[in-house]
């Protein structure tokens, strides 16, 4: 069994813009059109059985909506397991703990943070309570 542990897909309506932004920000050529269907097509072509989708919230106000979509995707298909996202500027410790409880309840197995796209260092003090809550 082959598992691709680092993939990205976006809702169909957001995929074109997301792919453009990600390509420009990373300086890399991206493959496919950024949709779930495109990801599964590449998986089938390459003999990949399972994949993990790693969403990134570039703004704190995106965290909850992205995470709800990831839970929905996990409930309606089984080829790609979606992780959640978190942002260092998420509103409060209480909100963060509530969000983590929601994610655990719905079977989310990991959370993606991205220092480069979210403008922080891994040892940033804003993340201490997040790391502790995840432990």
Listing of model-derived features with the role each one plays in the protein:
Residues 50, 58-135:
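Active-site gating/metal-coordination segments in enzymes
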Residues 1-53, 60-61:
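An N-terminally biased module of ancient metal coordination in phosphate/nucleic-acid-related enzymes
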């Amino acid at each position: 069994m082959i598992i691709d542990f680092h993939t990205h897909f976006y809702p169909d309506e957001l995929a074109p813009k997301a792919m453009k932004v990600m390509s420009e920000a990373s300086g890399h050529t991206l493959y496919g059109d950024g949709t779930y269907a495109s990801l599964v097509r590449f998986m089938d072509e390459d003999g990949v059985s399972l994949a993990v989708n790693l969403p990134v919230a570039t703004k704190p106000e995106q965290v909850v909506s992205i995470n709800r979509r990831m839970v929905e995707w996990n409930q309606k298909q089984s080829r790609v397991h979606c992780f959640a996202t978190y942002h260092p500027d998420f509103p409060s410790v209480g909100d963060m703990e509530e969000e983590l409880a929601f994610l655990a309840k719905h079977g989310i197995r990991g959370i993606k943070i991205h220092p480069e796209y979210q403008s922080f260092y891994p040892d940033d003090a804003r993340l201490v309570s997040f790391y502790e809550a995840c432990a």
